Protein backbone atom coordinates (compact mmCIF):
# COMPACT_ATOMS: atom_id res chain seq x y z
CA UNK A 1 0.00 0.00 0.00
CA UNK A 2 2.80 2.36 0.94
CA UNK A 3 4.77 1.60 -2.26
CA UNK A 4 1.67 2.24 -4.38
CA UNK A 5 1.13 5.55 -2.58
CA UNK A 6 4.74 6.61 -3.28
CA UNK A 7 4.34 5.66 -6.97
CA UNK A 8 1.12 7.65 -7.28
CA UNK A 9 2.70 10.64 -5.59
CA UNK A 10 5.69 10.46 -7.96
CA UNK A 11 3.39 10.21 -10.99
CA UNK A 12 1.34 13.21 -9.83
CA UNK A 13 4.52 15.21 -9.34
CA UNK A 14 5.68 14.23 -12.85
CA UNK A 15 2.37 15.36 -14.37
CA UNK A 16 2.09 18.59 -12.37
CA UNK A 17 5.67 19.64 -13.14
CA UNK A 18 5.92 18.14 -16.64
CA UNK A 19 7.27 21.31 -18.23
CA UNK A 20 10.04 21.60 -15.63
CA UNK A 21 11.00 17.98 -16.24
CA UNK A 22 11.04 18.61 -19.99
CA UNK A 23 13.44 21.51 -19.44
CA UNK A 24 15.72 19.17 -17.47
CA UNK A 25 15.88 16.53 -20.23
CA UNK A 26 18.78 18.15 -22.21
CA UNK A 27 20.91 18.42 -19.05
CA UNK A 28 20.12 14.81 -18.09
CA UNK A 29 20.99 13.54 -21.57
CA UNK A 30 24.21 15.57 -21.60
CA UNK A 31 25.22 14.05 -18.24
CA UNK A 32 24.43 10.51 -19.38
CA UNK A 33 26.29 10.82 -22.69
CA UNK A 34 29.36 12.73 -21.54
CA UNK A 35 29.67 11.76 -17.85
CA UNK A 36 28.22 8.28 -17.28
CA UNK A 37 28.66 6.37 -20.55
CA UNK A 38 32.43 7.14 -20.67
CA UNK A 39 32.76 5.45 -17.26
CA UNK A 40 32.81 2.14 -19.14
CA UNK A 41 36.41 3.09 -19.92
CA UNK A 42 37.28 2.30 -16.29
CA UNK A 43 37.66 -1.31 -17.47
CA UNK A 44 40.92 -0.29 -19.17
CA UNK A 45 42.51 -0.05 -15.70
CA UNK A 46 42.25 -3.84 -15.41
CA UNK A 47 43.47 -4.65 -18.92
CA UNK A 48 46.61 -4.70 -21.01
CA UNK A 49 44.68 -2.45 -23.34
CA UNK A 50 45.29 -2.83 -27.05
CA UNK A 51 43.52 -0.21 -29.23
CA UNK A 52 43.38 -2.67 -32.14
CA UNK A 53 41.64 -5.37 -30.07
CA UNK A 54 39.37 -2.83 -28.41
CA UNK A 55 37.84 -2.61 -24.96
CA UNK A 56 36.08 -5.98 -24.96
CA UNK A 57 38.86 -8.13 -26.44
CA UNK A 58 41.97 -6.79 -24.69
CA UNK A 59 43.75 -9.10 -22.23
CA UNK A 60 42.59 -8.92 -18.61
CA UNK A 61 45.50 -8.56 -16.17
CA UNK A 62 43.69 -7.82 -12.90
CA UNK A 63 45.48 -5.39 -10.59
CA UNK A 64 48.85 -5.39 -12.38
CA UNK A 65 48.41 -1.79 -13.55
CA UNK A 66 47.84 -0.69 -9.96
CA UNK A 67 50.92 -2.62 -8.77
CA UNK A 68 53.02 -0.64 -11.25
CA UNK A 69 51.91 2.62 -9.64
CA UNK A 70 52.05 1.58 -5.99
CA UNK A 71 55.25 -0.48 -6.01
CA UNK A 72 57.59 2.46 -5.26
CA UNK A 73 57.59 5.62 -3.15
CA UNK A 74 56.73 7.92 -6.04
CA UNK A 75 52.97 7.56 -5.57
CA UNK A 76 53.25 8.89 -2.00
CA UNK A 77 55.11 12.00 -3.17
CA UNK A 78 52.69 12.91 -5.93
CA UNK A 79 49.67 12.17 -3.73
CA UNK A 80 51.08 14.41 -1.00
CA UNK A 81 51.79 17.20 -3.50
CA UNK A 82 48.29 16.93 -4.98
CA UNK A 83 46.52 17.07 -1.61
CA UNK A 84 48.85 19.77 -0.25
CA UNK A 85 48.34 22.12 -3.20
CA UNK A 86 44.58 21.67 -3.28
CA UNK A 87 44.19 22.18 0.47
CA UNK A 88 46.25 25.36 0.23
CA UNK A 89 44.21 26.53 -2.77
CA UNK A 90 40.91 25.87 -0.97
CA UNK A 91 41.89 27.49 2.35
CA UNK A 92 43.62 30.58 0.95
CA UNK A 93 41.04 30.99 -1.82
CA UNK A 94 38.12 30.83 0.61
CA UNK A 95 39.68 33.33 3.03
CA UNK A 96 40.63 35.86 0.35
CA UNK A 97 37.34 35.51 -1.57
CA UNK A 98 35.37 36.07 1.65
CA UNK A 99 37.51 39.08 2.59
CA UNK A 100 37.10 40.66 -0.85
CA UNK A 101 33.35 39.99 -0.90
CA UNK A 102 32.80 41.54 2.55
CA UNK A 103 34.98 44.57 1.80
CA UNK A 104 33.33 45.33 -1.53
CA UNK A 105 29.85 44.86 -0.06
CA UNK A 106 30.65 47.26 2.77
CA UNK A 107 31.88 49.87 0.27
CA UNK A 108 28.43 50.03 -1.33
CA UNK A 109 27.56 50.39 -5.03
CA UNK A 110 29.90 53.13 -6.19
CA UNK A 111 31.57 53.24 -9.62
CA UNK A 112 34.90 52.36 -7.97
CA UNK A 113 33.44 49.12 -6.59
CA UNK A 114 32.04 48.14 -9.98
CA UNK A 115 35.39 48.78 -11.64
CA UNK A 116 37.11 46.70 -8.95
CA UNK A 117 34.68 43.83 -9.53
CA UNK A 118 35.46 43.84 -13.25
CA UNK A 119 39.21 43.92 -12.59
CA UNK A 120 38.95 41.09 -10.03
CA UNK A 121 37.18 38.62 -12.31
CA UNK A 122 39.34 39.38 -15.37
CA UNK A 123 42.16 36.91 -14.43
CA UNK A 124 39.59 34.09 -14.33
CA UNK A 125 39.21 34.38 -18.11
CA UNK A 126 42.95 34.24 -18.85
CA UNK A 127 44.07 30.70 -19.66
CA UNK A 128 46.94 29.10 -17.75
CA UNK A 129 49.10 28.63 -20.89
CA UNK A 130 48.98 32.42 -21.38
CA UNK A 131 49.94 32.91 -17.72
CA UNK A 132 52.77 30.41 -18.27
CA UNK A 133 54.13 32.47 -21.15
CA UNK A 134 54.11 35.63 -19.02
CA UNK A 135 55.74 33.77 -16.11
CA UNK A 136 58.81 33.08 -18.27
CA UNK A 137 59.26 36.83 -18.69
CA UNK A 138 59.16 37.25 -14.91
CA UNK A 139 61.10 34.20 -13.68
CA UNK A 140 63.88 33.67 -16.25
CA UNK A 141 67.28 33.68 -14.53
CA UNK A 142 69.11 36.25 -16.69
CA UNK A 143 66.46 38.39 -18.37
CA UNK A 144 63.49 37.94 -16.01
CA UNK A 145 61.85 41.07 -14.62
CA UNK A 146 62.21 39.94 -11.00
CA UNK A 147 65.93 39.13 -11.27
CA UNK A 148 66.65 42.35 -13.13
CA UNK A 149 64.96 44.27 -10.32
CA UNK A 150 66.96 42.36 -7.68
CA UNK A 151 70.19 43.12 -9.55
CA UNK A 152 69.27 46.80 -9.71
CA UNK A 153 68.88 47.06 -5.93
CA UNK A 154 72.02 45.02 -5.31
CA UNK A 155 70.28 41.87 -4.04
CA UNK A 156 71.22 38.33 -5.06
CA UNK A 157 69.24 36.88 -7.94
CA UNK A 158 67.06 33.76 -7.71
CA UNK A 159 67.24 30.85 -10.13
CA UNK A 160 63.52 30.07 -10.10
CA UNK A 161 63.64 27.09 -12.45
CA UNK A 162 66.15 25.13 -10.35
CA UNK A 163 64.92 26.12 -6.87
CA UNK A 164 62.05 23.75 -6.08
CA UNK A 165 61.24 25.14 -2.60
CA UNK A 166 60.11 28.48 -4.00
CA UNK A 167 57.41 27.09 -6.28
CA UNK A 168 54.70 26.03 -3.77
CA UNK A 169 54.17 29.66 -2.59
CA UNK A 170 54.37 30.90 -6.22
CA UNK A 171 51.66 28.45 -7.29
CA UNK A 172 49.44 29.40 -4.33
CA UNK A 173 49.80 33.14 -5.06
CA UNK A 174 49.09 32.69 -8.78
CA UNK A 175 46.05 30.55 -8.02
CA UNK A 176 44.75 33.28 -5.69
CA UNK A 177 45.33 35.93 -8.34
CA UNK A 178 43.35 33.92 -10.89
CA UNK A 179 40.44 32.52 -8.84
CA UNK A 180 39.83 34.65 -5.73
CA UNK A 181 38.07 37.46 -7.59
CA UNK A 182 35.56 35.14 -9.22
CA UNK A 183 34.97 33.39 -5.89
CA UNK A 184 34.30 36.77 -4.27
CA UNK A 185 31.46 37.38 -6.75
CA UNK A 186 29.76 34.17 -5.55
CA UNK A 187 29.98 35.25 -1.91
CA UNK A 188 28.78 38.77 -2.77
CA UNK A 189 25.67 37.26 -4.35
CA UNK A 190 25.04 35.34 -1.12
CA UNK A 191 25.58 38.47 1.00
CA UNK A 192 23.03 40.41 -1.07
CA UNK A 193 20.44 37.78 -0.12
CA UNK A 194 20.84 38.40 3.63
CA UNK A 195 17.87 40.24 5.16
CA UNK A 196 18.80 43.92 5.56
CA UNK A 197 16.51 44.28 8.58
CA UNK A 198 18.98 42.20 10.58
CA UNK A 199 21.68 44.81 9.99
CA UNK A 200 19.30 47.67 10.79
CA UNK A 201 18.29 46.00 14.05
CA UNK A 202 21.93 45.40 14.96
CA UNK A 203 22.87 49.04 14.29
CA UNK A 204 19.96 50.25 16.40
CA UNK A 205 21.37 48.14 19.24
CA UNK A 206 24.73 49.90 18.79
CA UNK A 207 26.61 47.24 16.79
CA UNK A 208 29.62 48.46 14.81
CA UNK A 209 30.38 47.45 11.21
CA UNK A 210 32.93 44.91 12.38
CA UNK A 211 30.44 43.36 14.78
CA UNK A 212 27.83 43.14 12.01
CA UNK A 213 30.34 41.33 9.81
CA UNK A 214 31.33 38.76 12.45
CA UNK A 215 27.91 38.34 14.08
CA UNK A 216 25.62 38.48 11.02
CA UNK A 217 27.41 38.29 7.64
CA UNK A 218 29.84 35.43 8.27
CA UNK A 219 27.37 33.22 10.23
CA UNK A 220 24.76 33.69 7.47
CA UNK A 221 27.34 32.61 4.88
CA UNK A 222 28.11 29.37 6.69
CA UNK A 223 25.95 27.19 4.43
CA UNK A 224 27.42 28.75 1.27
CA UNK A 225 30.97 28.30 2.56
CA UNK A 226 30.37 24.64 3.44
CA UNK A 227 28.66 23.93 0.12
CA UNK A 228 31.51 25.46 -1.91
CA UNK A 229 34.02 23.62 0.28
CA UNK A 230 32.29 20.29 -0.43
CA UNK A 231 32.27 21.01 -4.15
CA UNK A 232 35.98 21.89 -3.99
CA UNK A 233 36.72 18.76 -2.00
CA UNK A 234 35.64 16.63 -4.94
CA UNK A 235 38.60 18.01 -6.87
CA UNK A 236 41.11 17.73 -4.04
CA UNK A 237 42.75 14.82 -5.87
CA UNK A 238 42.71 16.75 -9.12
CA UNK A 239 46.23 17.78 -10.03
CA UNK A 240 45.63 21.16 -11.73
CA UNK A 241 47.36 19.90 -14.87
CA UNK A 242 46.79 23.02 -16.96
CA UNK A 243 48.08 25.32 -14.22
CA UNK A 244 51.20 23.52 -13.02
CA UNK A 245 52.29 22.10 -16.37
CA UNK A 246 51.92 25.51 -18.04
CA UNK A 247 54.17 27.07 -15.41
CA UNK A 248 56.68 24.27 -14.76
CA UNK A 249 56.48 21.87 -17.71
CA UNK A 250 58.80 18.84 -17.58
CA UNK A 251 61.43 20.56 -15.45
CA UNK A 252 63.13 17.69 -13.58
CA UNK A 253 64.63 20.08 -11.01
CA UNK A 254 61.13 20.86 -9.70
CA UNK A 255 59.53 17.42 -9.94
CA UNK A 256 59.69 16.50 -6.23
CA UNK A 257 57.74 19.59 -5.13
CA UNK A 258 55.43 20.22 -8.09
CA UNK A 259 54.52 16.79 -9.52
CA UNK A 260 50.83 15.99 -8.98
CA UNK A 261 48.70 13.01 -10.01
CA UNK A 262 47.42 14.61 -13.21
CA UNK A 263 50.91 15.59 -14.33
CA UNK A 264 52.22 12.08 -13.52
CA UNK A 265 49.40 10.54 -15.58
CA UNK A 266 50.05 12.94 -18.46
CA UNK A 267 53.78 12.18 -18.45
CA UNK A 268 53.23 8.42 -18.11
CA UNK A 269 50.85 8.44 -21.07
CA UNK A 270 53.43 10.26 -23.22
CA UNK A 271 56.43 8.15 -22.17
CA UNK A 272 55.05 4.64 -21.61
CA UNK A 273 52.03 4.79 -23.89
CA UNK A 274 50.17 2.40 -21.58
CA UNK A 275 46.52 3.43 -21.34
CA UNK A 276 45.92 0.73 -18.71
CA UNK A 277 48.47 2.15 -16.26
CA UNK A 278 47.30 5.74 -16.69
CA UNK A 279 43.65 4.71 -16.31
CA UNK A 280 44.53 2.84 -13.10
CA UNK A 281 46.05 6.01 -11.62
CA UNK A 282 43.05 8.08 -12.74
CA UNK A 283 40.68 5.54 -11.15
CA UNK A 284 42.59 5.71 -7.85
CA UNK A 285 42.30 9.50 -8.03
CA UNK A 286 38.54 9.42 -8.69
CA UNK A 287 37.68 6.82 -6.02
CA UNK A 288 39.56 8.67 -3.25
CA UNK A 289 37.95 11.97 -4.29
CA UNK A 290 34.49 10.36 -4.21
CA UNK A 291 35.09 8.90 -0.74
CA UNK A 292 36.24 12.30 0.54
CA UNK A 293 33.12 14.06 -0.75
CA UNK A 294 30.74 11.45 0.71
CA UNK A 295 32.54 11.54 4.08
CA UNK A 296 32.68 15.33 4.26
CA UNK A 297 29.02 15.59 3.25
CA UNK A 298 27.98 13.19 6.03
CA UNK A 299 29.97 15.17 8.60
CA UNK A 300 28.48 18.45 7.34
CA UNK A 301 24.99 16.95 7.46
CA UNK A 302 25.41 15.92 11.09
CA UNK A 303 26.73 19.33 12.11
CA UNK A 304 24.21 21.33 10.09
CA UNK A 305 21.57 19.70 7.86
CA UNK A 306 21.23 22.78 5.67
CA UNK A 307 24.92 22.66 4.78
CA UNK A 308 24.87 19.16 3.27
CA UNK A 309 24.66 18.77 -0.51
CA UNK A 310 22.47 15.67 -0.28
Describe every region a protein language model picked out.
Residues 1-14:
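Short, Lys/Arg-rich, polar N-terminal cytosolic tail immediately upstream
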Residues 12-310:
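A structural signal for multi-pass alpha-helical bundles of membrane permease subunits
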Amino acid sequence: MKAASIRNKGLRDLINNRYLYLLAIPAVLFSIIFAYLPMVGVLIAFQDFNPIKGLWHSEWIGLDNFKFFFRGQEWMTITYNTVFFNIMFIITGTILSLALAVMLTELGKSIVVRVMQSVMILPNFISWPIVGLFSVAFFTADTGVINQFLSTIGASTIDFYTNESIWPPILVVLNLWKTAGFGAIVYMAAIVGIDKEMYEAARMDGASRLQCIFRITLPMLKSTIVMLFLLSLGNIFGGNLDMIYSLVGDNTFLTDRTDTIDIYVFRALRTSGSLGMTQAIALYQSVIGFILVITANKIAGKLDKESALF
